[in-house]
Swiss-Prot record:
This is Chaperone protein DnaK. Gene3D superfamilies: 3.30.420.40, Actin, Chain A, domain 4, Substrate Binding Domain Of DNAk, Chain A, domain 1. It comes from the Bacteria. Acts as a chaperone. It comes from Aquifex pyrophilus. PROSITE patterns: HSP70_2 (PS00329), HSP70_3 (PS01036). Pfam families: HSP70. The modification Phosphothreonine is found at T202. Belongs to the heat shock protein 70 family.
Length: 605
């Protein structure tokens, strides 16, 4: 089953699940995780013993230990705390600014601030290990997908997460583009599709044209704050308000109750995709402070009521679809197929709105949870030389430019420009005898610099003094195939190049990334030792059970002195099972049991 130098494809999910796939021959195969599931919840939890749980084991702890369990971390990756203040209020763990003002998580059991990149790395490491178990060989490289609307900082942070997990991220790719590849657009002739990607935390729409081994992205649009989690929040808010009306208690103040409400809301949403009504039943949700008696939450929610709650959210997705169509200069009737991606597309109202808008049923032949990872695996196959003849032309989601005199944003690369791309413009000084200029790199659609997202700042110094307008400064923007931006500036006046290369930082320095990698390695060693100790104790427990059973069955056939000695060994083993922290202690005791028969048929001596 092994293949030389396999590159895996990973869909690093946000609110819900992550998926890993790999090319096996001509087919993209989704790999099961260690629990036997094809979907791995993007959840990480820290125990009191500082053990790190990932996936289903972590998700099961979310209600019991909400402060130490992180979900939805992708919402915070590569973001400043000030940007995510409101979102931070909606999770059960503490989101705080680190020393640089970046969003981080204050996890008591971790004993430190945990960065979103570290959480992503734990999930990626689990997927990497699942792939290694499946392939029977080490995996060192991966293609990872991100929402099309992720900015450069968020993309770099995702690459850093891969590095921490021990993966070389050979390509960062837009999720809708991967879905088009899994759909087989490159195999069709002159087809135009629209990918409607409604996931747990983000919404993206891309319009692509394909044929003869080429996939070209014509337009992309989206919202990184619109997804299934927003639907869950609407249900949660309804439950909270209904409970408050009935009992006068605001459940927002109770972190454990909030986590239970979140899980119940998500489950209700899923059930209403195939049922007309569901009952939400949360016994012992809180205690009445006046009577000190437990209170229960029990509510019926109909599909019609849910659709009323979320109608405006689905309409927002259609508005974004309209924007993408306008950018691509096409009409709804020009779209040959609408491909659905993301678990939220299972909602009947979503499918109904798409059908009404396009006048046709959306394509439902692909599993919306797995399609992105499969597309990533196909791209990984292209990079590994296993899949031939696919040319991909992706685009930039937002305008990129610099701040110029008067606080204006001057655009160098317009929205929906195919990448990779390199563009430059020549600027001059604003003041007489100016010897340095500030290059302020911006990302956004607004005309004024202050209204757009600041990506980077640097100074070009050593400009010979001259009247304003004389020096000529060339600024070059270069976006690579990963969508990562590099900026260079040089003084053309002297003929001598002075350049500064700016690579967008995720907020982590190389030293910090190395420290996190080292910590992860140390944690992995600790986890391995803990696992080995547990296995040794389990083996000891089995030996105790076996010897007790043998002694009982043998009865009077066992000499009194041998029985007394055996019981002493059993007692010591039981204490060791309870208290031992050293594996050698358990292993040494295992040797004692080899002196006794494993069956009453064998003689005791």
């Amino acid at each position: 089953m092994a293949g030389k130098g396999k590159i895996i494809g990973i869909d690093l999910g946000n609110e819900t699940n992550s998926v890993v796939a790999v090319m096996m021959g001509d087919e993209a195969v989704v790999i099961q995780n260690q629990e036997g599931s094809r979907l791995t919840p993007s959840v990480v939890s820290w125990t009191k013993e500082k053990e790190v749980l990932v996936g289903d084991p972590a998700k099961r702890r979310a209600i019991l230990d909400p402060e130490n369990t992180v979900y939805e971390s992708k919402r915070f990756i590569g973001r400043k705390f000030e940007e995510v203040k409101e979102e931070a209020k909606r999770v059960s763990y503490k989101v705080v600014p680190d020393e640089k003002g970046d969003a981080a998580f204050d996890i008591p059991n971790a004993g430190k601030l945990v960065r979103p990149e570290e959480v992503g790395a734990h999930v990626l490491r689990k997927l990497k290990e699942a792939a290694e178990a499946f392939l029977g060989e080490p995996v060192k490289k991966a293609v990872i997908t991100v929402p099309a609307y992720f900015n450069e900082r968020q993309r770099q942070a995702t690459k850093d997460a891969g590095k921490i997990a021990g993966l070389e991220v050979v390509r960062i790719l837009n999720e809708p583009t991967r879905a088009a590849m899994a759909y087989g657009l490159h195999k069709k002739e002159n087809v135009r599709i629209l990918v409607y990607d409604f996931g747990g935390g983000t919404f993206d729409v891309s319009i692509l044209e394909g044929g003869d081994g080429v996939i070209e992205v014509k337009a992309t649009a989206g919202d990184t704050h619109l997804g299934g989690a927003n639907i869950d929040e609407r249900i949660m808010e309804w439950l909270i308000e209904e409970f408050k009306k009935e009992h006068g208690i605001d459940l927002r103040q109770d972190r454990t109750a909030l986590q239970r409400l979140k899980e119940a809301a998500e489950q209700a949403k899923k059930e209403l995709s195939f049922k007309m009504e569901t009952e939400i039943n949360l016994p012992f949700i809180t205690i009445d402070p006046n009577t000190n008696q437990p209170l229960h939450l029990q509510k019926k929610l109909t599909r019609a009521r849910l659709e009323e709650m979320i109608n405006d959210l689905i309409d927002r997705t259609i508005d974004i679809v309209k924007q993408a169509l306008e950018d691509a200069n096409v009409k709804p009737s020009d779209i040959d197929e609408v491909v659905l991606v993301g678990g939220s597309t299972r909602i009947p109202l979503v499918q109904q709105k798409i059908k009404e808008f396009f006048g046709k049923e959306p394509h439902k032949g692909l599993n919306p949870d797995e399609v992105v990872a499969m597309g990533a695996a196909i791209q990984a196959g292209v990079l590994a030389g296993e899949v031939k003849e696919i040319v991909l032309v992706d685009v930039t989601p937002l305008e990129l430019g610099v701040e110029t005199y008067g606080g204006v944003m001057t655009v160098l690369i317009p929205r929906n420009t195919p990448i990779p791309v390199k563009k430059s413009k020549v600027f001059t000084t604003a003041h007489d005898y100016q010897t340095e200029v500030e290059i302020h790199v911006l990302h956004g659609e607004r005309p004024l610099a202050k209204d757009n997202k600041s990506l980077a700042k640097f100074y070009l110094t050593g400009i010979p003094p001259a009247p304003r307008g004389v020096p000529k400064i060339e600024v070059c923007f270069d976006i690579d195939a990963d969508g990562i931006l590099h900026v260079t500036a040089k003084d053309l006046g002297t003929g001598k190049e002075q350049s500064v290369r700016v690579e967008i930082s995720s907020g982590l320095t190389p030293e910090e990334i190395e420290r996190i990698i080292k910590e992860a390695e140390e944690t992995r060693e600790e986890d391995r030792k803990k696992k080995e100790l547990i296995e040794a104790k389990n083996q000891l427990d089995h030996l105790v059970y076996q010897l007790e059973k043998t002694l009982k069955e043998a009865g009077d056939k066992v000499p009194a002195d041998v029985k007394q000695e055996a019981e002493k060994v059993i007692e010591e083993a039981k204490k060791t099972i309870e208290t031992a922290t050293d594996i050698n202690e358990a292993k040494e005791l295992q040797k004692e049991f080899s002196r006794y028969p494993q069956s009453s048929e064998q003689p005791f001596t």
